[in-house]
């Protein structure tokens, strides 16, 4: 049998000499052997096929995790942080503008001279960024009471609420509350209701958009925390959509009233909330998925 050198094979295969050595060292060239520091390669050896480590399609979650890890500016992760934080906080009364929210995310500073800002708005904005990081990191994990409480703890940490004796940061409410004029679960009922809700939800191996929305409606009706339920609920929505390869969405200001109507009318007409969220999904696809620097990403 005739043998060729690494240089000869590299020229024949149109690859670098380093690639040829790697193929040989990995055992991918039959009957090639090393003598001293020299590889002897059969003259009839064929070039190994390139292995493709990323056979699975790149998902939105992959992109978010990659851009988060690499602190990529201007991509899907960057825009999701700003849009989800601004809109979700704005729904709950935050007076920070979109530009102020963006400035805090991008610079971790506040560039305001004459305007008076609510300190809690600033703290909760910074905390919400961390919440989004958490749902991206933990997107594939099973939804649990512990994780939900951790989201609330992150969101409310360092706020004026956290200094109130009756306000349980990272734990279920101590006092009765309401949402939209509707009664919610009493404090003594919350733990049991949350366990039942999660058990029923997690009993299904795969979740549809309707399953995730149904959980969201029931979560908001329990209203387990003293405050912050809407934001925690919408963070859970986003996480679960990522987990089950459903396009996530952000409820913007012009969809807010339709969203609230959908929550209220869910038992009678699921279409109100579903259609609102489908509209929000279309916007997310249009604004984020298409312009992403990572072509080929799927939900």
What positions do the PLM features span?
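FIC/Doc superfamily catalytic core
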Residues: 2-13, 17-22, 26-29, 34-290
